[in-house]
Amino acid sequence: MNNAEILKHVDHTLLKPVATWDDIKKICDESIEYNTASICIPACYISRIHATYGDKVNICTVVGFPLGYSSTEGKIAETKQALADGANEIDMVINISDVKNKAYDKVTEEIRALKEVVGNKILKVIIETCYLTEEEKIAMCKAVTEAGADYIKTSTGFGTGGATLEDIKLFKKHIGPNVKIKAAGGVSTVEDLNMFINEGCDRLGTSRAVGLLKGEETQGY
């Protein structure tokens, strides 16, 4: 797979808490130059990006990030504001405590509530695989499918681990046919980029892809 094809799968990501406007502009400029699938950035920058770049960049942001503890009502409010400001894609974090309490129906209903707000735009559901058992991961595949979300996403990049090939294979067995997969966290080499795409991931969340494909040493999400 050539570099251009890889980058079409990349959500070019900058979610570090110290991100400046200059950092954000660099991500936007790179996304335009290299035709990445989207930029994934903090919600506080959406309106400024939209005012500066218009439709030249596809804006993705995060909701309930990174711990997922916000109430459903809070996540809905975040989502509505993000969409109003110009976001086209929402990456939400589930309430992991609900999963641990086996309140799977509650998780499903929260995802469904956010998908109703997102409508025909894209909703990705971060399940933070590093904290879940195999049984819980399978339950979340079912929840994401039943709730009508567009993607299941492995990780925030802020947990104790990121995407693994084993989790991608597990997802493929248990998600519905309309659900796509996003790998994030630990996508840190060119080999990783190719491996996850070849395994069936439609999106990759990483801050490193552009640098890696340019042959640069990079650090980040």
Swiss-Prot record:
Alphabetical keyword list: Cytoplasm, Lyase, Schiff base
Pathway listed: Carbohydrate degradation; 2-deoxy-D-ribose 1-phosphate degradation; D-glyceraldehyde 3-phosphate and acetaldehyde from 2-deoxy-alpha-D-ribose 1-phosphate: step 2/2
Active site as annotated: 91, 153, 182
Protein origin, superkingdom: Bacteria
EC numbers on record: 4.1.2.4
Substrates-to-products reaction catalysed: 2-deoxy-D-ribose 5-phosphate = D-glyceraldehyde 3-phosphate + acetaldehyde
MF-aspect GO terms: deoxyribose-phosphate aldolase activity
Intracellular or extracellular location(s): Cytoplasm
Cellular component GO terms, alphabetical: cytoplasm
Gene Ontology BP annotations: 2-deoxyribose 1-phosphate catabolic process; carbohydrate catabolic process; deoxyribonucleotide catabolic process
Keyword Coiled coil: no
Entry function: Catalyzes a reversible aldol reaction between acetaldehyde and D-glyceraldehyde 3-phosphate to generate 2-deoxy-D-ribose 5-phosphate.
Family from the record: Belongs to the DeoC/FbaB aldolase family. DeoC type 1 subfamily.
NCBIfam families reported for this sequence: deoC
Protein name: Deoxyribose-phosphate aldolase
Organism of origin: Clostridium botulinum (strain Eklund 17B / Type B)
